[in-house]
């Protein structure tokens, strides 16, 4: 009887251990398959709108603050080198660099503002994109795996994989390559080149120091909000994919999903109007929502 009781107790312990293990496995599976998110689309949209507002206000302030200094550069080589850097980077499109250097901005700095908006929007796009390779080239391989998973797995599976992968990838990537300060310094560099291309006087180092001193905090705040989007979209949302977008010139303008920020709103659109042509540059971030 004692032997039978001991055997029954052993079997019970084994069964309890097995049950605990299976329960833990089910909890893990439930976590992996759960698609409930704490972040609403409205919150994400509000964040993107805040980023766009910061881009506009920062570009407008910088372009206005330097209005008295456009065309005062004493050395044409400095202007030419800045135009070359902008042209090579494609950060403000193919046409704007030369236009900036050959236009008188002293009366109206609107072209400077547009160029600054374009540069800041493009840099914010790279900072906000979860799979951007502009700073972390390691993510390119992970993104290719994710793209393949999206073709064959459920949203709950590849969405959870994305959140976990990006969370742990961020943990091992050096802070100096991914923090707001690094992105802000990149923004300062391109603001500097735009101003130099417009003929602002001073050496590249002097103008850059001015930009950093007077607008560094603004640009870091912009970079911080872009990284907030990156973290939320990449690491917190499972049930859908949210991505910021920019349109690369010279793509054709499509009014069904693009907005012409400088259009004449007083002039009614005609259904027989000719195509609007190609875009010059993108000045704001767009937002795409995908759910499979």
Where is each model-derived feature located?
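Internal, charge-rich low-complexity segments
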Residues: 3-260
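Compact beta-sheet-dominated globular domain cores
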Residues: 167, 248-292
